[in-house]
Curated annotation (Swiss-Prot):
Cofactor(s), names only, from the UniProt record: Mg(2+)
Catalytic activity line of the entry: alpha-D-glucosamine 1-phosphate = D-glucosamine 6-phosphate
Protein name per Swiss-Prot or TrEMBL: Phosphoglucosamine mutase
Cofactor remark: Binds 1 Mg(2+) ion per subunit.
Family, similarity comment: Belongs to the phosphohexose mutase family.
């Protein structure tokens, strides 16, 4: 079996709807291939959730057909955050969980990602086994062994109660005014209820999904509307989730953005204050230098993993630590959950706000963010601009200018045809100029 993935990226199979591999016929076969592999594992039961994209209906049906042909039973949750599917997979003792979502991407993209029976990303060997099955022709099991489908009617209520259980029982959100932006995505019927039931006054936005407006000028990838609303409503803070509820960005009462690095810092510092910190914090190559320095001042260990929440998870398991994050808003808290969970992460920050009697603004000021500029350059074809001599020369020049007061990172996106150029340092003007210089070199060599 080849150890090179053809379809699975860093976060499952993803692409534009109607274009291979996000087509009904491929997804049907993917369901069958996954079913063939999972049927060998045990229960033959799979939990399937989705976000609010209009294409979710089509892909859900295709998956169901493929799984049934392989003899697996599918239980559908309807629109449900990705971490909720991970949780329900565990609690129902299912063989796997499947999420139909393209996370923070626009509505015209979609994807399929899998969770193991433990609520974690599938192991590499299972993904490779599924890919191997995709090369075969579909063979139905005998009619008497075909899988059935059912719907889980209380999925939302179960997950709401789970989220609330991660908030300290002695604390309440009473007296807090929150603006909650659900990105017109999978948290729209979950998150506002979680915070309300814990006592907060909630102003909800991004809670009117129509299949086409997921992540559209709302949510964790675009917090401008949230920033404006928090200030207008004189709210204590705002929380923004992405389309599938595994990313969170927060906004303080002044309208300042609080990203994944700052959120992880606040959670780690609060755990240290309570004497409950287990180990250190895992970030990524994109994590701001300010977070690393802020944690160092507190005596909290910090290491970087490759970009992608699966690599953060791998490093956490390797180190035996509990807190990991990406600045984009993936926050993994292994003492609470098995994967990135935006609502649960938000609740831990709120617990810090209430428990310390400090504002989010005050808590976030504990670390100083270095200016960081990210440029995305789209490319096509099989050429790798990162190998071009002109690009390497531009990087060398910038690194020499920044010296020890900054850093450069170039990488290919794991989910889109993009080269990501990141420059970080103390001098904001120099950082901006440097990022544009490298991005132009990449464009010229695409």
């Amino acid at each position: 079996m080849s150890d090179k993935r053809r379809y699975f990226g860093t976060d499952g199979v993803r692409g534009k709807v109607g274009q291979y591999p996000i087509t009904p016929d491929f997804v049907l076969k993917l369901g069958w291939a996954a079913g063939r592999v999972l049927a060998k594992q045990g229960t033959r039961k799979v939990i399937i959730g989705k976000d609010t994209r209009i294409s979710g209906y089509m892909l859900e049906s295709a998956l169901e057909a493929g799984l049934a042909a392989a003899g697996l039973k599918a239980t559908f949750t309807g629109p449900m955050p990705t971490p909720a599917v991970a949780y329900l997979t565990q609690t129902f003792r299912a063989e796997a969980g499947i999420v139909i979502s393209a996370s923070h991407n626009p509505y015209y993209d979609n994807g399929i990602k899998f969770f193991s029976y433990e609520g974690t990303k599938l192991p590499d060997d299972i993904e490779l086994a599924i890919e191997a099955e995709l090369d075969k022709d579909i063979e139905c099991v005998e009619s008497a062994e075909l899988g059935k489908a059912s719907r889980m009617v209380d999925a939302a209520g179960r997950y709401i109660e789970f989220c609330k259980s991660t908030f300290p029982s002695k604390l309440s959100l009473s007296g807090l005014k929150l603006v909650v932006d659900c990105a017109n995505g999978a948290t729209y019927h979950i998150a506002p209820n979680v915070f309300r039931e814990l006592g907060a006054e909630v102003i909800a936005m991004g809670v009117e999904p129509n299949g086409l407006n997921i992540n559209d000028q709302v949510g964790a990838t675009d917090v401008r509307a949230l920033q404006k609303r928090v200030v207008e409503e004189h709210a204590h803070l705002g929380l923004a989730f992405d389309g599938d509820g595994d990313r969170i960005i927060m906004v303080d009462h002044l309208g300042n953005k609080v990203d994944g690095d700052q959120i992880a810092y606040i959670i780690a510092r609060d755990a240290l204050r309570r004497g409950e910190l287990k180990g250190g914090v895992v970030g990524t190559l994109m994590t701001n230098l300010g977070m690393e320095n802020g944690l160092k001042q507190l005596g909290i260990p910090f290491v970087r993993a490759a970009v992608g929440d699966r690599y953060v998870m791998e490093k956490l398991l390797e180190k035996g630590w509990k807190i990991g994050a990406e600045n984009s808003g993936h926050v993994i808290l292994l003492d609470k959950v098995t994967t990135g969970d935006a609502i649960v992460a938000g609740l831990q920050v709120l617990a810090s706000v209430v428990g310390s009697e400090m504002t989010l603004h005050e808590l976030a000021k504990g670390m100083t963010l270095y200016p960081q500029v990210l440029e995305n350059v789209r490319f096509a074809g099989d050429n790798n601009p990162l190998e071009a001599d002109a690009v390497k020369a531009a990087v060398s020049e910038v690194e020499a200018e920044l010296g020890s007061k900054g850093r450069v990172l170039l990488r290919k996106s794991g989910t889109e045809p993009l080269i990501r150029v990141m420059v970080e340092g103390e001098d904001e003007t120099l950082v901006k100029q440097s990022a544009l210089k490298i991005a132009q070199a990449v464009k010229d060599n695409c």
